[in-house]
């Protein structure tokens, strides 16, 4: 039986079909499934991506409206959250794709 690819890789492939970069798809999957909002350092360590790849991916995800920044009291780091509703995510992906197709 073939091994199922890890969840971030599946989301990265789906995101690439809609115009997201692979690192953005991986970061989104990690943010969406995280028990607590991760920071960029958490994503770098957990996904094995470079800090610059993660930073670029986070900017791309913010531009698409797929993630939001959050701050923890007393902490200077930015943490990231994603919509919990899968239908909201689909809506954001499709509207982002449409904006990029028309532009």
Regions found by a protein language model. Give the residues of each.
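Short, Lys/Arg-enriched N-terminal segment that forms or immediately precedes the first helix
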Residues: 3-17
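Short, cationic-aromatic polyanion-contact patches
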Residues: 17-23, 39, 72-93
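Pre-recognition alpha-helix immediately N-terminal to the DNA-recognition helix
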Residues: 26-29
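Short acidic, hydrophobic short linear motifs in intrinsically disordered regions
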Residues: 36-42
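A short acidic, leucine-rich amphipathic alpha-helix
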Residues: 42-48, 61
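Key DNA-contact positions within bacterial/archaeal DNA-binding proteins
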Residues: 52
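Glycine-centered, phosphate/nucleic-acid-interacting loop/turn motifs that mediate DNA/RNA or nucleotide
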Residues: 65
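Short beta-strand "wing" residues that participate in macromolecule-binding interfaces
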Residues: 69
């Amino acid at each position: 039986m073939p091994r199922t690819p890890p969840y971030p890789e599946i989301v990265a492939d789906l995101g690439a079909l809609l115009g997201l970069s692979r690192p953005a798809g991986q970061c989104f999957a990690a943010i969406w499934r995280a028990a607590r909002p991760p920071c960029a350092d958490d994503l770098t360590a957990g996904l094995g991506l470079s800090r610059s790849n993660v930073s670029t991916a986070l900017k791309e995800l913010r531009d698409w409206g797929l993630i939001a920044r959050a701050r923890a009291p007393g902490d200077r780091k930015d943490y990231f959250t994603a919509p919990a509703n899968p239908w909201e995510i689909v809506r954001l992906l499709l509207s982002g794709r449409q904006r990029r197709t028309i532009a």
